[in-house]
Every structure is written in structure tokens, then in C-alpha cells.
Curated annotation (Swiss-Prot):
Reaction equation(s) it catalyzes: 1-(5-phospho-beta-D-ribosyl)-ATP + H2O = 1-(5-phospho-beta-D-ribosyl)-5'-AMP + diphosphate + H(+)
UniProt KW keywords: Amino-acid biosynthesis, ATP-binding, Cytoplasm, Histidine biosynthesis, Hydrolase, Nucleotide-binding
Record HAMAP family: HisE (MF_01020)
Gene: hisE
CDD domains per UniProt: NTP-PPase_HisIE_like
A single cellular component GO annotation: cytoplasm
Full protein name: Phosphoribosyl-ATP pyrophosphatase
Lineage, top ranks: Bacteria, Pseudomonadati, Pseudomonadota, Betaproteobacteria, Neisseriales
SUPFAM superfamilies noted in UniProt: all-alpha NTP pyrophosphatases
Length: 107
């Protein structure tokens, strides 16, 4: 289920790239460029931290959803997709975190 939801959201975000910025929040962010998108991602990340400190699970889920959404917009700005991140996570699955980190420092 999660993958299909991410795919549907990704498809909508990609379609919004060519939408009128006055009619679409996503198109507006993409039109304003990377700095505006990064500002939103940072803002949403801060809200995730605050929600975590609040110890309210539903609020945390809400804010993480916002962060994921805005991160997907950032990926789209760079012509990447959520699927690219899922592929990277799949690549790392079953790999020790310490081994993965060591492999990064070697390359």
C-alpha cells in the first residue's frame, strides 16, 4: 500500500511541474526554485523535531508526512523520484549499518 501511495503522490508532483504556479502549490514551489524548496524542507524538518518532543504520535506522523511530501518535491526538482530513494533503501536492506558506512568512506 505505501509504495502505491508514494507512486501516486510522485505522479501528481511530476504532473504539477508543468502546471500554472498560480493554481498549484507544488507548481509554485517548483517555479520558485531550489532555495524556496530547501527552505520548506528545513521548516518541515524542524516541525518534525518539535512534534517528536511533544510526544504526540499523530502529530509526529502528520509532520513526517509533510516532510516526506516536501522532500519529494525537492527530488522532483532534481529530476529524481521517490522510487530512487526506495531503490537505495532496498540496496541497503540486509547490509549492516556499520558496513554500509565503511563502504561510503572507502569510495
Amino acid at each position: 500500500m505505501g509504495d502505491s501511495v508514494l507512486s501516486a503522490i510522485q505522479q501528481t508532483i511530476t504532473q504539477r511541474k508543468s502546471a500554472n504556479p498560480s493554481e498549484s502549490y507544488v507548481a509554485q514551489l517548483l517555479h520558485k526554485g531550489e532555495d524556496k524548496i530547501l527552505k520548506k524542507v528545513i521548516e518541515e524538518a524542524g516541525e518534525v523535531l518539535m512534534a517528536s518532543k511533544d510526544k504526540n504520535p499523530s502529530h509526529l506522523v502528520y509532520e513526517v508526512a509533510d516532510l516526506w511530501f516536501h522532500t519529494m518535491i525537492l527530488l522532483t526538482h532534481h529530476d529524481l523520484k521517490a522510487e530512487d530513494v526506495l531503490d537505495e533503501l532496498a540496496r541497503r536492506q540486509g547490509l549492516s549499518g556499520l558496513a554500509e558506512k565503511a563502504a561510503r568512506t572507502e569510495s
